[in-house]
UniProtKB/Swiss-Prot annotation:
Residues annotated as the enzyme's active site: T7
Any matching Pfam family: Proteasome
Entry keyword Metal-binding: yes
Function of the protein: Protease subunit of a proteasome-like degradation complex believed to be a general protein degrading machinery.
Protein name: ATP-dependent protease subunit HslV
Catalytic activity: ATP-dependent cleavage of peptide bonds with broad specificity
GO BP terms: proteolysis involved in protein catabolic process
UniProt organism field: Alkalilimnicola ehrlichii (strain ATCC BAA-1101 / DSM 17681 / MLHE-1)
EC nos: 3.4.25.2
GO molecular function: metal ion binding; threonine-type endopeptidase activity
Record keyword Metal-binding present: yes
Top-rank taxon, per record: Bacteria
Length: 183
């Protein structure tokens, strides 16, 4: 049976603003099944952002599990991510999921994989999914050669990825944590 797949998730931090954005396309084989899926969420009373790349059905399970870890470790993003990665690697059901998560709060930005990896990206930006390399390249150039806000940077880079990657569209969902606001 073919998997639902194809997405692009990009996270960036600039001037105290943290943004995670994702496109809305869900693909089954060679067919676009949905164009407005939300692959980015707010967790832990809006203080943590999370984006998902992988099979759509797996997203709810992973978001729920990660939220449980955030509650257990009182919002400590790094500790919750490490424990989530351990569970993901060792749990028989979770181990079968092929996915990646980007999670971020005001202090940290991490990628969590089913292999048990927790990666702290360089340069305050990271992208995952089929269009991830395109979004990462565009975001890196924009970060180095523009004064765009984190939100504008994510919007522009995801737009570029949507122009290049057939599994990515321009129907974006974006969540952000501002530098001073009570998001």
């Amino acid at each position: 049976m073919e998997q639902f797949r194809g997405t692009t998730i990009l996270a960036a931090r600039r001037d105290g603003q943290v943004v995670i954005g994702g496109d809305g396309q869900v693909t089954l084989g060679h067919t676009v099944m949905k164009g407005n899926a939300r692959k980015v969420r707010r967790l832990h009373n809006g203080r943590v952002l999370a984006g998902f790349a992988g099979g759509t059905a797996d997203a709810f399970t992973l978001f729920e599990r990660f939220e449980g870890q955030l509650e257990k470790y009182r919002g400590n993003l790094t500790r919750a991510a490490v424990e989530m990665a351990k569970d993901w690697r060792s749990d028989r059901v979770l181990r079968r999921l092929e996915a990646l998560l980007i999670v971020a709060d005001r202090e940290a930005m991490l990628v969590i994989s089913g292999n048990g990896d927790v990666i702290d990206p360089e340069d305050d930006l990271v992208a995952i999914g089929s269009g991830g390399p395109y979004a990462q390249a565009a975001a890196t150039a924009l970060m180095r050669h523009s004064q765009l806000s984190a939100r504008e940077l994510v919007e522009q880079a995801l737009g570029i990825a949507g122009d290049i990657c057939i599994y990515t569209n321009r129907n974006l969902s974006i969540e952000e944590l501002g530098p001073d606001s009570e998001d």
